[in-house]
């Protein structure tokens, strides 16, 4: 592991005992204590580059104050424009930020765009209320008022997920501050249930990255290996990539769980990133609070089992980096300048690649996803319904295998980063996933789409496994 990876791990691990300290604290101590810890971590890891996050926060707050009715689009333009400046600093002859600064900036961008959207929703609701002349009560998830500058700073620098996620809305943050009877919210047992696979994933990461180092792919000797060996190598590389993020995101979720952050009654049917989808009145007594069943779906960032064993490329996206996927769906996909599912997905993947960075490998990887989505959707609707139950089960296993190989292939761009290294590797395996996706798309178009009833009856199974294994 690199020194940077050790630093990330230490930050994640110390967040767990800190969470237990803050869990039962009052709103004021939670707000300012969590912000002080987060700011301290930022200053320690980023040093003077912390100024970038401060400038981004102040700029967004100014836009919210100046144009509350359109601040969402303005905040999106401002934060994404600042990302371009932030990543071009070395080209401008300015000091290059640390990797930790980049991590803080990425999560901060998501939080500030979401905050602006929540403020805009509040402004629209207030205007509708004034026009109608009566109040219907606060809609689900609406903010009580526009956050002040200090409140915006406290949300932005809250230590929870400050470098690794999960992303959370300001409404989720407020619910944590104002959580009634936090002592009744379970933490230790949910944390242990969530944390148990992390040591195994960590060992698998160390083993796979040692046996199959990524640097080997950049060496000329690698391309003298036979084709089967080159094809196989992307499998353990992506495996190590997954194990690394599984450990990081599970540890980040455990930090949230320790603090009771993102805990809602199961009846609220919370979604990762978005929070509750059903109104659930707060408990009126400690006994009532203790009788409720809670979950931490709001801050759930990874579903390890379904990431590995779901059938389709589309499902695989849904279970990976789940809170960020919610953000992309809510703020990018829904406002995409196209109506086609594939084109909207391409737009979303383009901005996702930009959010990650300027390395060409990001764009090569992310912009391969829409092709895979189009291919699997077209072939699914044209062919799967023609098969019997046994044939559909076999189809799903083959589909799952190809989905995993597609992600293996695309991950090489994500980890190799450069245009030369990515294209060199893909060329060495004859751009197999691109060729296969184009062939599947062509076959699906040639066969045509099935009838609506047939497509519905031939819907893919959620997983090729016989039963659904959950980690919690």
UniProtKB/Swiss-Prot annotation:
Alphabetical UniProt keywords: Acyltransferase, Endoplasmic reticulum, Glycoprotein, Lipid biosynthesis, Lipid metabolism, Membrane, Phospholipid biosynthesis, Phospholipid metabolism, Transferase, Transmembrane, Transmembrane helix
Cytoplasmic side stretches: 1-5, 58-73, 213-231, 448-472
Catalytic activity field: a 1-acyl-sn-glycero-3-phospho-(1D-myo-inositol) + an acyl-CoA = a 1,2-diacyl-sn-glycero-3-phospho-(1D-myo-inositol) + CoA; a 1-acyl-sn-glycero-3-phospho-(1D-myo-inositol) + (5Z,8Z,11Z,14Z)-eicosatetraenoyl-CoA = a 1-acyl-2-(5Z,8Z,11Z,14Z-eicosatetraenoyl)-sn-glycero-3-phospho-(1D-myo-inositol) + CoA; (5Z,8Z,11Z,14Z)-eicosatetraenoyl-CoA + 1-hexadecanoyl-sn-glycero-3-phosphocholine = 1-hexadecanoyl-2-(5Z,8Z,11Z,14Z-eicosatetraenoyl)-sn-glycero-3-phosphocholine + CoA; 1-octadecanoyl-sn-glycero-3-phospho-(1D-myo-inositol) + (5Z,8Z,11Z,14Z)-eicosatetraenoyl-CoA = 1-octadecanoyl-2-(5Z,8Z,11Z,14Z-eicosatetraenoyl)-sn-glycero-3-phospho-(1D-myo-inositol) + CoA
Subcellular location: Endoplasmic reticulum membrane
Predominant subcellular localization, coarse grouping: endoplasmic reticulum
A GO biological-process term: layer formation in cerebral cortex
Residues of this chain annotated as glycosylated in UniProt: 321
One GO term describing the cellular component: endoplasmic reticulum membrane
Membrane-topology annotation of the record: Multi-pass membrane protein
InterPro entries: LPLAT_7/PORCN-like (IPR049941), MBOAT_fam (IPR004299)
Pathway in which this enzyme or protein is active: Lipid metabolism; phospholipid metabolism
GO molecular function (one): lysophospholipid acyltransferase activity
All ranges on the Lumenal side of the membrane: 23-33, 94-194, 262-426
Record's keyword annotation contains Nucleotide-binding: no
Disordered as annotated region, ranges: 450-472
Domain of life: Eukaryota
Chain ranges passing through the membrane: 6-22, 34-57, 74-93, 195-212, 232-261, 427-447
EC number: 2.3.1.-
Function comment: Acyltransferase which catalyzes the transfer of an acyl group from an acyl-CoA to a lysophosphatidylinositol (1-acylglycerophosphatidylinositol or LPI) leading to the production of a phosphatidylinositol (1,2-diacyl-sn-glycero-3-phosphoinositol or PI) and participates in the reacylation step of the phospholipid remodeling pathway also known as the Lands cycle. Prefers arachidonoyl-CoA as the acyl donor, thus contributing to the regulation of free levels arachidonic acid in cell.
Protein family (similarity comment): Belongs to the membrane-bound acyltransferase family.
Subunit structure: Interacts with SPTSSA; the interaction facilitates MBOAT7 location to mitochondria-associated membranes (MAMs).
UniProt-recorded name of the protein: Membrane-bound acylglycerophosphatidylinositol O-acyltransferase MBOAT7
Name of the gene encoding the protein in the UniProt record: MBOAT7
